[in-house]
Amino acid sequence: FYRFIPNEYGKLHKGGQLQAMMVKGKPQFDSRNWNNKAMVLHQELEVEWVNLDNPESPKDDLRLRGYKQGAALFARGEGIHWGDKELYFCCTNGGKKQLGQVMKYQPSEFEGTDKEAQQPGKISLFVESTSKTLYNFGDNLTVSPNGHLIVCEDQYTDVVDNHLRGVT
């Protein structure tokens, strides 16, 4: 998961710093839960950010370089939506059964500033599917007017049976 800190707010053309998320005190944290349950539902983990050089990545190795520097692993990150002071994103094939996860990020009050370490942002596992009937390969997502998360499935199977799933 990445963020960009501009050199000058509102003027992206003036450059800045691309950063990757790292779980505080747990470098190279594996949120996928494929082999072991490192990420527990609703457990908030404080984050730090790793600076990434050469973000154009002509060798297509940005994620690998970030991981070597301690960035967390997420399973096929896709859809993203800003809710009410929180951000949600899909990890399409995350989870023990590899049916999908939704992560929730709560930014620091001091996000992107020198004071951020005093009150870091927090990442948590919001949803992890244990059954295809619950949730299967979430891709895009949004937050409805009543605050519930709506996730669009995106399976690649012989019989395509995708749904919109509501998460409360």
Segments (PLM) and residue ranges:
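Sequence/structural signature of beta-propeller domains
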Residues: 1-168
